[in-house]
Amino acid sequence: MKTLYSLRRFYPVETLFNGTLALAGRDQETTGFAWWAGNARLINLSGKLLGAHVAHAGLIVFWAGAMNLFEVAHFVPEKPMYEQGLILLPHLATLGWGVGPGGEVIDTFPYFVSGVLHLISSAVLGFGGIYHALLGPETLEESFPFFGYVWKDRNKMTTILGIHLILLGIGAFLLVFKALYFGGVYDTWAPGGGDVRKITNLTLSPSVIFGYLLKSPFGGEGWIVSVDDLEDIVGGHVWLGSICILGGIWHILTKPFAWARRALVWSGEAYLSYSLGALSVFGFIACCFVWFNNTAYPSEFYGPTGPEASQAQAFTFLVRDQRLGANIGSAQGPTGLGKYLMRSPTGEVIFGGETMRFWDLRAPWLEPLRGPNGLDLSRLKKDIQPWQERRSAEYMTHAPLGSLNSVGGVATEINAVNYVSPRSWLATSHFVLGFFLFVGHLWHAGRARAAAAGFEKGIDRDFEPVLFMTPLN
């Protein structure tokens, strides 16, 4: 396969101190890459690169299956999922598998099936990865031109982009079909404390769906993370799936316009940087979703959100003190504000005390006690149900705080369990991974732009200042 650039000009060189090191007959001088840039071997070997990608997919799916079975093997039905450090079973439960009213697990067999299916799939992918890495053709262009490509071929690149978009769109519709036709999904807002239900009355109004994108990202608004009913979530997947599929067809059928050809860098490393940037955005959005949203990530499985645990504590002590004779409507706290109830900046009745900062929390166990002007005093006096008390007491002692040594919960809470909430794990890991992916995006974007501009990044090591300085010792 002919490469359209000379390698020396096309690839920016990272100059090492020991640029003469040769591994497996490859050295930096002839390849333009140092020994540690292993993937660079595959840049123009589409068959081998396919093998690397398929094998990587196999590793990912193997982890999913093995970890899934590990969680099933360790699962104790009598304890909530979030007390057991589970991160995969909550996702399956949220999709409506194996759970009943109140999020109670009634059948673990679907979880077992999921794990086995992923393990079997990973074996197929692993075989394909090894085959293409070791036995298959090094390049696909000659034998399988449909699957072959040259990184500079803009039309082919947008065709590949289109195929990926269609696959993502199909993925979005899988959730829609599960919610509509295949048993429904878990709705934490179902009356009486959550249940699995089919989502029939989808929100398809563009003003509602795209209105989320126009919201402020700050408190009370919360951008797309503020979504709090499944009709909007599933309807959003209809819109997203449709846009992805139509956009995919568009990119397959068209060639890039002149402005896009000029504006973008068209090289393998540039595409890598675009992908890392996109994954970084996904990571940051996922972080915010799992930390703040208790509809897409129901508290029955993931534990309460931070604001939810705080409000649950205020509610629990309001219930206790009201039983002991306190007048919750008029009791004053140490600051002169209401001890149990006060008003928000916009006039709603909210919980008093330190939890006032979380006054815009919405949670299924609390909403029935609200009226048109916030918390309703008469409902708080007469209508609190036992399930609401039980759930808030449970959430109060399971705040999503905690450190790596698993001493979780609130430090001052004597009844707390030593655990780290899955919300803490998932939010932290996705933030950290999103950050690293962003750094990788900047790194590869800088290299790709430098290569396209025709210059090499880096200092000429022969004249590096440190070589002319007095040794420290």
UniProtKB/Swiss-Prot annotation:
An example of a Gene Ontology cellular component annotation for this protein is: photosystem II
Residues annotated as carrying N-acetylthreonine in the record are T15
Proregion residues are 1-14
Keywords on record: Acetylation, Chlorophyll, Chloroplast, Chromophore, Manganese, Membrane, Metal-binding, Phosphoprotein, Photosynthesis, Photosystem II, Plastid, Thylakoid, Transmembrane, Transmembrane helix
For the modification Phosphothreonine, which residues carry it? T15
Where, subcellularly, is it found?
Plastid, Chloroplast thylakoid membrane
Q: Establish whether keyword Glycosyltransferase is in the entry.
A: no
> Which Gene Ontology molecular-function terms are recorded?
chlorophyll binding; electron transporter, transferring electrons within the cyclic electron transport pathway of photosynthesis activity; metal ion binding
List residues traversing the bilayer.
69-93, 134-155, 178-200, 255-275, 291-312, 447-471
UniProt keyword Transport, yes or no: no
Q: How is the cofactor bound?
A: Binds multiple chlorophylls and provides some of the ligands for the Ca-4Mn-5O cluster of the oxygen-evolving complex. It may also provide a ligand for a Cl- that is required for oxygen evolution. PSII binds additional chlorophylls, carotenoids and specific lipids.
Gene Ontology biological process terms, A to Z: photosynthetic electron transport in photosystem II
Function text: One of the components of the core complex of photosystem II (PSII). It binds chlorophyll and helps catalyze the primary light-induced photochemical processes of PSII. PSII is a light-driven water:plastoquinone oxidoreductase, using light energy to abstract electrons from H(2)O, generating O(2) and a proton gradient subsequently used for ATP formation.
Subunit-level organization: PSII is composed of 1 copy each of membrane proteins PsbA, PsbB, PsbC, PsbD, PsbE, PsbF, PsbH, PsbI, PsbJ, PsbK, PsbL, PsbM, PsbT, PsbX, PsbY, PsbZ, Psb30/Ycf12, at least 3 peripheral proteins of the oxygen-evolving complex and a large number of cofactors. It forms dimeric complexes.
Q: Which family does it belong to?
A: Belongs to the PsbB/PsbC family. PsbC subfamily.
Q: What HAMAP family does this protein's entry cite?
A: PSII_PsbC_CP43
Q: What is this protein called?
A: Photosystem II CP43 reaction center protein
- Gene name linked to the record: psbC
